[in-house]
Amino acid sequence: MQRRKFVEMGAVCALALTAALPARAEAERPILVAASFDAMAELVKAVGGSLVRVETLIPPGAEPHDFTPTVKTTQLLRAASVLVVNGFGMEPWAKKIAAAAENPRLMLVTASEGAVSVKNSDPDEIAEHGADDPHLWLSLSGAEIEARNIAEALAKADPKNAEAYRMQFTLFKGKLHVLKTQYSARFRNVKRRFFVPATPLLLISAGTSILSRRAWKAFSQRENPRRSGSQSLQSS
């Protein structure tokens, strides 16, 4: 599936961008944050650093929509201060498991809040996942929105360190902007402006204004590229 393919990419990017926060005093424990899957966990680490301890609900490689909560899930959420989910229909079970935890301190945060979704154009994807492409974290601007929402949630859950979370977000945002500038400069002089994305959001990361798009749905983990499609790409 597309999500499975790109969660690791998003995680690596977030880790590479993370800067260190000042460590807590030895007697002060980091707040516990539950994240729905790896990409959300890495964004939490990017703005939370040593001030947070992050636990992921969905095992690596598993699909969010196939997730079934366990007793361990409930125990984790009863102890957590924040639950971070992506949204855009990726975790339809989020509100239910948050309520089941019966933890009045638990703050449910939808990282994509305020973002405008990219619409799915593949009929199979629409039938399976809905009209919105949920892979917001793959876009540099999308990652910025999600990181900001997470930082603000952490600031509310841990007000003593609110400024530290906001400072870390500012650093993270600056590095995202540097990456965007670098990629824009590299693509500006590309003569053959042709790009095959496995998800439309990769076009946003690359810069849609300077690349032409030919999305090819055979580029996914569950499908092998068709010979006719491959020949078409080679001749482009």
Protein language model features and the residues they cover:
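Extracytoplasmic metal-acquisition and chelation regions
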Residues: 2-3, 8-11, 25-236
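Bacterial N-terminal signal peptides
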Residues: 10-18
